[in-house]
C-alpha cells in the first residue's frame, strides 16, 4: 500500500447526506468517489440485473431467504451474500490501488486491516425527513407526506443496521465502530 494514499469510508443514516458529503469530500481531496458505482460493478461480477442489485445490495438475508438458499446438505449463498461478496472484493481492490472515498457497504469493516478514516454521519429524524422530501421530484413530492417519508427513513435505517451488523458483528452507528461521528444537522453538508 502506498503511504500517501487517502482512504475515507462513510457510514450513514438514511437522509443524513452521506452521498453528497462523500462526493464533495472526494472532490475537495481530488480523489475517486464510490457509492452507486458499486451497483454497476456488482452487476458485471454477479450477472444479476441492475435493478435487482440496486434493490438488494446493502441488505442482509432474512430467515425466509436464508432458508430458501441453504439446503440440508450444502449451503448455497443467497443473492444478498453473492452481492456482498463481490462488493467486498471490489472495495478491497479499489482501496489497494487508489485514494478514494467509499460510501456505505460496511467499507469501514472491510478495510479494517488497512489505514483509513471511518466516518459515520447522522442527523435528527425531522431533518432527515426534510432532506429526503426536498430531494423528491415534484411529481413524487405531491404524493409523499412527511409521515410516509419518515416510515421510509426508518425502514432504510433498519435495513442498513441489519446489513452492517449481519456482515460485521459490530454495532452500526456506535462510537466505537468509527473514527469520527458527524451530526450533519449541526455541521451542515458543507461543514461535514
Residues covered by each model-derived region:
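Glycine-rich phosphate-binding P-loop
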Residues: 10-26
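Conserved phosphate-donor/acceptor-positioning beta-strand/loop module used by diverse small-molecule
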Residues: 113-133, 142-155
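Short beta-strand-centered segment that lines the nucleotide-binding/catalytic pocket of NTP-utilizing
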Residues: 32-44
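Small-molecule kinase domains that catalyze NTP-dependent phosphoryl transfer to phosphate-bearing small molecules
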Residues: 63-67, 141-190
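ATP-dependent small-molecule kinase phosphotransfer cores
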Residues: 43-99
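Conserved nucleotide-binding/hydrolysis micro-motifs of P-loop NTPases
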Residues: 107-109, 123-128, 186-188
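Pre-Walker A (Motif I) flank of P-loop NTPase domains
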Residues: 3-12, 98
Amino acid at each position: 500500500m502506498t503511504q500517501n494514499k487517502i482512504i475515507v469510508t462513510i457510514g450513514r443514516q438514511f437522509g443524513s447526506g452521506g452521498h453528497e458529503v462523500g462526493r464533495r469530500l472526494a472532490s475537495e481531496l481530488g480523489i475517486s468517489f464510490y457509492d452507486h458505482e458499486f451497483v454497476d460493478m456488482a452487476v458485471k461480477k454477479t450477472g444479476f440485473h441492475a435493478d435487482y442489485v440496486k434493490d438488494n445490495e446493502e441488505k442482509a438475508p432474512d430467515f425466509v431467504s436464508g432458508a430458501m438458499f441453504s439446503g440440508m446438505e450444502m449451503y448455497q449463498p443467497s443473492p444478498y451474500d453473492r452481492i456482498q461478496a463481490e462488493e467486498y472484493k471490489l472495495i478491497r481492490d479499489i482501496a489497494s490501488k487508489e485514494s478514494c472515498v467509499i460510501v456505505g457497504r460496511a467499507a469501514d469493516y472491510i478495510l479494517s486491516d488497512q489505514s483509513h478514516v471511518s466516518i459515520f454521519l447522522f442527523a435528527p429524524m425531522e431533518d432527515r425527513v426534510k432532506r429526503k422530501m426536498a430531494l423528491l421530484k415534484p411529481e413524487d413530492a405531491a404524493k409523499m407526506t412527511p409521515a410516509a417519508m419518515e416510515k421510509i427513513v426508518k425502514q432504510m435505517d433498519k435495513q442498513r443496521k441489519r446489513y452492517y451488523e449481519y456482515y460485521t458483528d459490530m454495532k452500526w452507528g456506535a462510537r466505537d465502530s468509527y473514527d469520527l461521528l458527524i451530526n450533519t444537522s449541526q455541521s451542515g453538508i458543507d461543514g461535514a
